[in-house]
Amino acid sequence: MSKGMSNMPHQRPGEGTVVDVVVTPLESVNGLGRASLQTQISSLPVPNKRYSADTAFLGYSHGYAKLLFGQEKFGTDGELRTLLIIKLGLSWVRSFIDGVNKAEFPLRQAVASSGVQAEALPEFREEPKDTVSFDATMIVAGVNGVDGCVDFYYSSPFALERTAVSKKLAVDPVVRVNVRAGLLLGLVDQLETLLETHKDEIVN
């Protein structure tokens, strides 16, 4: 399978929108080489799927971060109507956090300028019957006042295989999540803690 993947000259049809990327080698982690992939946000298609989140949780399982977004039943004590689960590898979480901390207009600064504080994430109870799950490899987040927005994208191993040579990447828009800015900032803080806790498990 690996040999076949390496011989593919172009991105396969159906992998997603092909965008130009800048590949920058980075310092190795755990003895393994790694690189950052950067692209212009304006070149990324906006996901068609939309989800309005009232709350968020963070989990970890089998080497993956689980970002959970929930819609609460109105008039209840946080009982969930629906739940959206986004699964990301730790290396992709690290890429997102690096981007947040090094951005020209840092997320924390943008939130603080509106007087919004990071919210503590609640303790997760149980999944509602209406639960869906997606994979993601890229996160794009933004805030404006009290409102936050997170776009998730996925690039398959097939798409990533040729990136270093072609300087192009096929990205599949997964879902856009609308969430409070304070809740988004609280999630970012917890993701940083998760990375520190599991830093020895990052494989690339």
Model-derived regions, located:
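Positively charged, low-complexity terminal tracts
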Residues: 2-204
